[in-house]
């Protein structure tokens, strides 16, 4: 027998087989059960959602030999003939190819004849909106008052094109497009029945590409089966649909979260090398931000999601998620106006990166512990008096700026791997702490002395204010600078512009903020040797270390401990299995074992792994390991027995908790946290 495509092979044979559309199935079933049958039904909806299939099922219920029923037997001659498409009293008409009024009149001439075999003569007109205006006019009278043995079933994808006179004569049922979850679950059921291995992410992509159509999803699945040699894998589906690797959008979100321009540009270059679609890339980023926002709002539903999303949902604030989403969605609209689509995508992501909190706080705010006297009066009082305002020299500004610790010169410990940051910064700190401390104390002491003398000079100047001026007079354009005290005059003098000021409240914090906010300001290492020592370590590279949960060394450690705890896990590792066969073995547990027979248990939720090819490969590997033929049996068993894959997860979680506890108790790390006012990101700690 020739191969039959999935869309035809799995066409629903009863109302219970229809996926979704419960609101329509219920209405039709109740009408058949109570014998309340209208003479004309209109089924509308997008392609591939079941309009024709439901119409045929309804015709089967009308003409079943056992009577009008919502549950036709499917075994009688009438049911089989309708299913095979050769029932003489079911007239199917394609309105797209028979649009002329002559075709409609020929059809209506046969309405007067009673059904030959069945109980009702059923006219199924597909794509009825394609009929001409004259054809609709010819159909009106018969559609309004047909013989009692005639039923009209109309199907259309565009009900808006139907005349209102036709709509008013029919019962209208609109079929909804199915969501991705319904489609992916239906595909999983079909592939399980067909004994075809599949990966869940692949089915999600197929369901998304189907855009609500069951028929489209089955056609795409047929294509994926052919491309994957009877295996539906994530890579095959991605290549078939021309989709980008999920890692691209995930890496971009990591880069935006970290404020890591290097990782962002490297990822965009990888997308360009793969000839990716830039609009799709931004769309995938927006979709993943939507998933992250949902996980933040409904964390109890995040257990089945990718671990990357769980990490990002915990570490990106909801405000930043919304901001990144808005920037990316707006940027997609600008792609058509960009010089080319790559530049448009890059500028969109760089715009999101430019507002990252890391860059907004890169210029440190003044944290002055020395506050000028609060009673300083305004330079121009409301009475019209004004006084000269002393201006700090550049040397004093520079000295005070150097005295303030520059926190931006130390990478944020919360964004680094705790172990790497501890080892790296401890060495630098031990070398520079004593020298820095002595130097900073000396500069602060000198600055305090200068500021105190300036305050005294300022207080003295208040007593010698200039004559009173009327409020109507314009304010002076310039304010003369008095001679600085002798201690301040001894410092190196630099050219200083005269400031236009209407206020005598010149505070150290304001002066420092002007310096730090200048366009030419960039933070630098206070000790050049410290900058040289840091050139070998890139903060973004250190951050990446914690994002990789399992290193090769850690994987080997987990596998070794699993072998020690479970006999079946040890057999699996020694057998040399790979691919689907190994995945099946790791999800099984040992029920019984003899010299020539092994019985395994498999939880029912993993039943899709029990494929003939995988079982055959597993049996061959076990026979080769034992040196003789082994009879292998795999039974579905939901007993509470730990499988090797669950052992691995438990061991990894235990190692992770141990690493977190050890770091939280580490005395050196506590010193670093206190010294730099840092916080330990416990969720980012990974075992090694």
Curated annotation (Swiss-Prot):
It catalyses: DNA(n) + a 2'-deoxyribonucleoside 5'-triphosphate = DNA(n+1) + diphosphate. ATP binds at residues 45-52. Residues 484-499 have a biased composition (Polar residues). It holds the Pfam family DNAX_ATPase_lid. CDD domains: AAA (cd00009), HLD_clamp_pol_III_gamma_tau (cd18137). DNA polymerase III is a complex, multichain enzyme responsible for most of the replicative synthesis in bacteria. This DNA polymerase also exhibits 3' to 5' exonuclease activity. It comes from Haemophilus influenzae (strain ATCC 51907 / DSM 11121 / KW20 / Rd). Its EC number is 2.7.7.7. Zn(2+) binds at residues 64, 73, 76, 79. Belongs to the DnaX/STICHEL family. Gene3D superfamilies: 1.10.8.60, 1.20.272.10, DNA polymerase III, tau subunit, domain V (3.30.300.150), P-loop containing nucleotide triphosphate hydrolases (3.40.50.300). Residues 452-506 are annotated as: Disordered. One of its GO terms (cellular component) is DNA polymerase III complex. Keywords: ATP-binding, DNA replication, DNA-directed DNA polymerase, Metal-binding, Nucleotide-binding, Nucleotidyltransferase, Transferase, Zinc. DNA polymerase III contains a core (composed of alpha, epsilon and theta chains) that associates with a tau subunit. This core dimerizes to form the POLIII' complex. PolIII' associates with the gamma complex (composed of gamma, delta, delta', psi and chi chains) and with the beta chain to form the complete DNA polymerase III complex. Residues 470-481 have a biased composition (Basic and acidic residues). Signal peptide: none annotated. It comes from the Bacteria. GO terms for biological process: DNA-templated DNA replication. This is DNA polymerase III subunit tau/gamma. InterPro entries: AAA+_ATPase, DNA_pol3_clamp-load_cplx_C, DNA_pol_III_gamma-3, DNA_pol_III_sug/sutau_N, DNA_pol_III_tau_dom-5, DNA_Rep/Repair_Clamp_Loader, HLD_clamp_pol_III_gamma_tau, P-loop_NTPase. One of its GO terms (molecular function) is DNA-directed DNA polymerase activity. As has been shown for E.coli (strain K12) and suggested for Salmonella typhimurium, the gamma subunit (approximately resides 1-430) might be generated by ribosomal frameshifting, leading to 2 protein products from 1 gene.
């Amino acid at each position: 027998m020739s191969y039959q495509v999935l869309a035809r092979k799995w066409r629903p044979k009863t109302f219970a087989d229809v996926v979704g559309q419960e609101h329509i199935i219920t209405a039709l079933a109740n009408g058949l059960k109570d014998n309340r049958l209208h003479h004309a039904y209109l089924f509308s909806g997008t392609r591939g959602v079941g309009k024709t299939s439901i119409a045929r099922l309804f015709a089967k219920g009308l003409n079943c030999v056992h009577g009008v029923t919502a549950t036709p037997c499917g075994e009688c001659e009438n049911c089989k003939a309708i299913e095979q498409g050769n029932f003489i009293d079911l007239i199917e008409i394609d309105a797209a190819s028979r649009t002329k009024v002559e075709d409609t009149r020929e059809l209506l001439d046969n309405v007067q004849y009673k059904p030959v075999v069945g109980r009702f003569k059923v006219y199924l007109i597909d794509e009825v909106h394609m009929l001409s205006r004259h054809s609709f006019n010819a159909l009106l009278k018969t559609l309004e008052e047909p013989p009692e043995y005639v039923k009209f079933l109309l199907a259309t994808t565009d009900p808006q094109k139907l005349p209102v006179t036709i709509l008013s004569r029919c019962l209208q049922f609109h079929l909804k497009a199915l969501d991705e979850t319904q489609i992916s679950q239906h595909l999983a059921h079909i592939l399980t029945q067909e004994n075809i291995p599949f990966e869940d992410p692949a089915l999600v992509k197929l369901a998304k590409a189907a855009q609500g159509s069951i028929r489209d999803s089955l056609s795409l699945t047929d294509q994926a089966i052919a491309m994957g040699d009877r295996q539906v894998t994530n890579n095959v589906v991605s290549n078939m649909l021309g989709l980008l690797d999920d890692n691209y959008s995930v890496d971009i979100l990591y880069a935006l979260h970290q404020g890591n321009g290097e990782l962002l540009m490297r990822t965009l270059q990888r997308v360009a090398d793969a000839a990716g679609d830039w609009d799709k890339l931004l769309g995938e980023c927006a979709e993943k931000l939507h998933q992250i926002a949902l996980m933040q709002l409904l964390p109890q539903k995040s257990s089945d999601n990718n671990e990357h999303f769980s990490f990002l949902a915990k570490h990106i604030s909801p405000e930043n998620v919304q901001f990144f989403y808005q920037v990316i969605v707006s940027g997609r609209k600008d792609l058509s106006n960009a010089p080319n689509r790559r530049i448009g995508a890059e500028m969109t992501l760089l715009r999101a990166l430019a507002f990252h909190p890391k860059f907004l706080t890169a210029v440190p705010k003044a944290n002055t512990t020395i506050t000028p006297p609060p009673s300083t009066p305004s330079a121009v009082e409301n009475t019209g008096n004004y006084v000269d305002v002393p201006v700090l020299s550049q040397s004093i500004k520079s000295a005070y700026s150097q005295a303030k610790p520059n926190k931006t010169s130390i990478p944020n410990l919360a964004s680094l791997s705790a172990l790497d940051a501890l080892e790296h910064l401890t060495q630098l700190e031990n070398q520079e702490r004593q020298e820095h401390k002595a130097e900073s104390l000396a500069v602060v002491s000198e600055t305090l002395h200068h500021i105190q003398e300036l305050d005294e000079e300022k207080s003295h100047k208040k007593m010698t204010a200039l004559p009173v001026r009327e409020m109507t007079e314009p304010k002076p354009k310039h304010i003369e600078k008095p001679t600085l005290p002798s201690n301040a005059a001894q410092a190196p003098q630099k050219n200083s512009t005269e400031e236009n000021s209407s206020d005598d409240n010149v505070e150290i914090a304001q002066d420092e903020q002007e310096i730090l906010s200048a366009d030419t300001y960039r933070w630098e290492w206070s000790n050049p040797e410290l900058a040289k020592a840091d050139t070998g370590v890139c903060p973004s590279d250190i951050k990446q270390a914690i994002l990789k949960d399992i290193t090769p060394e850690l994987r080997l450690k987990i596998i070794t401990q699993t072998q020690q705890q479970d006999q079946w896990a040890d057999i699996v590792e020694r057998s040399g299995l790979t691919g689907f066969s190994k995945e099946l073995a790791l999800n099984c547990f040992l029920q019984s074992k003899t010299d020539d027979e092994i019985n395994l248990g498999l939880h029912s939720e993993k039943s899709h792994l029990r494929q003939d090819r995988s079982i055959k490969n597993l049996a061959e590997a076990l026979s080769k390991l034992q040196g003789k033929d082994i009879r292998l049996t795999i039974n579905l068993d939901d007993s509470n027995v730990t499988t090797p894959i669950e052992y691995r997860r438990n061991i990894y979680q235990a190692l992770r908790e141990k690493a977190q506890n050890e770091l939280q108790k580490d005395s050196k790390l506590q010193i670093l946290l206190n010294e730099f006012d840092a916080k330990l990101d416990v969720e980012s700690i990974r075992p090694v």
